[in-house]
Amino acid sequence: MINVMNPMKGGTEKGLDPQLWHACAGGMVRMPPMNSKVFYFPQGHAENAYDCVDFGNLPIPPMVLCRVLAIKYMADAESDEVFAKLRLIPLKDDEYVDHEYGDGEDSNGFESNSEKTPSFAKTLTQSDANNGGGFSVPRYCAETIFPRLDYNAEPPVQTILAKDVHGDVWKFRHIYRGTPRRHLLTTGWSNFVNQKKLVAGDSIVFMRAENGDLCVGIRRAKRGGIGNGPEYSAGWNPIGGSCGYSSLLREDESNSLRRSNCSLADRKGKVTAESVIEAATLAISGRPFEVVYYPRASTSEFCVKALDARAAMRIPWCSGMRFKMAFETEDSSRISWFMGTVSAVNVSDPIRWPNSPWRLLQVAWDEPDLLQNVKRVNPWLVELVSNVHPIPLTSFSPPRKKMRLPQHPDYNNLINSIPVPSFPSNPLIRSSPLSSVLDNVPVGLQGARHNAHQYYGLSSSDLHHYYLNRPPPPPPPSSLQLSPSLGLRNIDTKNEKGFCFLTMGTTPCNDTKSKKSHIVLFGKLILPEEQLSEKGSTDTANIEKTQISSGGSNQNGVAGREFSSSDEGSPCSKKVHDASGLETGHCKVFMESDDVGRTLDLSVLGSYEELSRKLSDMFGIKKSEMLSSVLYRDASGAIKYAGNEPFSEFLKTARRLTILTEQGSESVVV
């Protein structure tokens, strides 16, 4: 049992056993450990009030860094609903240390020395909740939670004593009977149902405490379905430190909240508006304060583990990102995961909380019928699905999934027919308290997240169908033009053709001139395959592929395209020697299943045998005939098998090597 002093009332209140509290709260609830650091969100706290919260002109920040001083686990005297009181003390922003945990806390936000106590929850059926009926006990619960039953008796029967959240003891008769035989609670069950006002859909929780006592608790059902109704499932921290839960808001409630500056929790909240204002006032003054959290009734958690919030806000969120999110079912019997796409990134209440990350993400669900009212979520409650790409951008996508446009006018038509999006920027990067953290993230890591597939969330088959069936485009413009909102820059130096890059907020720089021109669209290379020819033009130079960069120059007009991925750096930091961005004698090596290649210096090798040994060492592949599994692309774009020409010629022309993972993979694109 936990007894925590309550300075606000000047007395001692009896707390509930934390293990029984968590069993009643549900499997998705995670409380922050003692001495851990959390962010307190007054905006979220206001949503838990049962009347309007008017902060007036108080200079309340959107989030306050705090340390957890005390946690008190309690239960409502009337409904048995569990809740917790947290005592927090504000900290200065400079007191935050990354990867810092509280005493006894592991990286997942739990107390590392705690062991899970066996418990079992069952959703009551109509028969279980009937007045005068009995309770059908699942076999697992009867054999693992209940005291051992003597099956040699006829009939096997026992009296069990169960202690509820208030310490009251309930007596039940447990019998094993029927055809087929089953475990039942008979005498004493009807009285328990009537006293606790249980209905079908509520859950009964049995737990065996560490001291051997049998405990019983209640988990009231959420009315209205998954993500619906006034009561939403909420969790303090992600399970396993990687995923989060439902901090949800209906679209109509969100609009009314912004219009009236009132809490959406009218007639649904559990705390008073005065207590919310008092807590926020104490927080901004740097004094300790207390908040109350109802895990089964609150719309969302408003004290978030600092590490989770920081990690979520380091991500440069943008529309099109794919994620998954966990929800507790209506009867709280299981946890289900749902896939979704970020549709927009903007502040939920720009007037009162202009810099708040609270409900920053507008989302669209793959199963909208089940989650039709869930329009906004907090970024720390979702898990990015980084290994699921709506558009496969690997270097070895099958040829049937590549789109090649043979004529130059078609390319202009393509650019002209695709609506150019305005890439949403993270509104918190410069204006929020998290900006200092975001500034420390390497630019290369930020840019790596901005892939074309993340903006659109389309599969390659969808795009292929679109291009085959799209209506005829308007006549092509005289020159290729892209929206300035993409940050496209043109640099022409005398008669030399420059580079074309999409800049994502990087510092402009003077790029080394190249004799070859290229274009990069949405961060991916467009590789022409045919020579551009215009009437009266004498320029017949081939346009070759070059590296991806975060900054550069632009050249209009190409013939075809090919999507590929690259991990090359900015041209500001290295000299470009040829169309591939590599010095002569260097090439990129890719495994068939990988997106990112490695740079190999061929000039230090003297034969194909040395090349075979080098590749085996680089990728840990032991093949007796390595060269038979290696394809390469030369400077002219031709694809050949390694070993078909003298090594000296191979050394001069090889620009890209691909190691086939299976023999006979002839459909691989190099």
Curated annotation (Swiss-Prot):
Tell me the segments the record calls region Disordered: 545-579
Q: Polar residues bias located where?
A: 545-557
Which stretches are labeled DNA-binding? 120-222
Predominant subcellular localization, coarse grouping: nucleus
User: What cellular component terms from Gene Ontology apply here?
Assistant: nucleus
**Would I find Nucleus among this entry's keywords?**
yes
SS bond list: none
Ranges for domain PB1 come to 584-664
Q: Do the record's keywords include Transcription?
A: yes
Write one Pfam family the protein is assigned to: ARF_AD
Instruction: State the source organism's domain of life.
Output: Eukaryota
Localization (cell): Nucleus
Q: What are the recorded Gene Ontology BP terms?
A: auxin-activated signaling pathway; cell division; pattern specification process; response to auxin; root cap development
For this chain, one GO molecular function annotation is: DNA-binding transcription factor activity
Record-linked InterPro entries = ARF_dom, ARF_plant, B3_DNA-bd, DNA-bd_pseudobarrel_sf, PB1-like
Give the signal peptide as a residue range, or say none if absent: none
Keywords attached to this Swiss-Prot or TrEMBL record, sorted alphabetically, are: Auxin signaling pathway, DNA-binding, Nucleus, Transcription, Transcription regulation
Subunit info here reads:
Homodimers and heterodimers.
As for what it does, the entry says: Auxin response factors (ARFs) are transcriptional factors that bind specifically to the DNA sequence 5'-TGTCTC-3' found in the auxin-responsive promoter elements (AuxREs). Could act as transcriptional activator or repressor. Formation of heterodimers with Aux/IAA proteins may alter their ability to modulate early auxin response genes expression.
Can you quote the domain comment?
Interactions between auxin response factors (ARFs) and Aux/IAA proteins occur through their C-terminal dimerization domains III and IV.
Tell me the protein family, please: Belongs to the ARF family.
Question: Could you identify this protein by its name?
Answer: Auxin response factor 16
What's the source species for this entry? Arabidopsis thaliana (Mouse-ear cress)
Ranked from the top, the taxonomy reads: Eukaryota, Viridiplantae, Streptophyta, Embryophyta, Tracheophyta
